[in-house]
Amino acid sequence: MLENNVKYEYTKTPLDYQITEYDCGTTTLLNALRYLFKRSEISPKVYKYILQYTLDKSNIFGEVRKGGTSVFALEFLCDWLNENAKSKEMNVKCTSIPKDDISINNKFLSDKIKNGAVAIVKLYQDCDHYCLLTKLDEEYAYLFDPYYLNINYYDNDKDIEIIKDKPFEYNRKVAKVRMDSKSKKDFSIVTNKDAVIIVIEKL
């Protein structure tokens, strides 16, 4: 029998997928922590707080939690992390990009991502949807989309590729021109009053 010499890194966990139609915000914020921190570094109190304050919206029919997570809730949680995470033994900083400056080509965003930070980005995908930005190059953005899809879902879209072999990093490769297209196409950045990009970095 051949000896298995592969060494695995068990200190972090793979990024995760949402388990309902509504928890993309919850899952993406937790994925930011999964990406940045070792499992042993993530405070259970922070985890519980995120679960408690996301999924705060009702839908147009008044059904509680079925409106997903509001921008207000995400910004509230990020402010709370800035104030309290250190006391919970997690050194993390969250920064919201001003709405007028929201773009995949924002220099502050690019610099932070290149230095190991991540960002929660609100995108269009049939409806408003949160994904985690983890990497950028000249032409493409690399994101983890918490909504699980078949590998061939975007075969007819030249701007989007589904990636299946980077579970700790990303699962979508998206052309930056698509993200800044100000359209209703998948992965176009939301630019209305609910637009949001929140940069999250480990200090």
For each feature predicted by the language model, list its residue ranges.
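Active-site-adjacent structural segments surrounding the nucleophilic cysteine of cysteine proteases
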Residues: 1-69
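General structural signal for secondary-structure boundaries
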Residues: 41-48, 66-73, 100, 104-105, ...
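Noncatalytic regulatory segments and standalone regulatory/sensor domains
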Residues: 113-114, 136-203
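Active-site-adjacent substructure of cysteine-protease-like catalytic cores
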Residues: 93-148, 152
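Papain-like cysteine protease catalytic cores
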Residues: 50-99, 104
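Generic short alpha-helical segment signal, independent of protein family or function
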Residues: 37, 79-86, 191-199
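Alpha-helix N-cap/loop-to-helix boundary motif
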Residues: 62-69, 101, 125, 191-194, ...
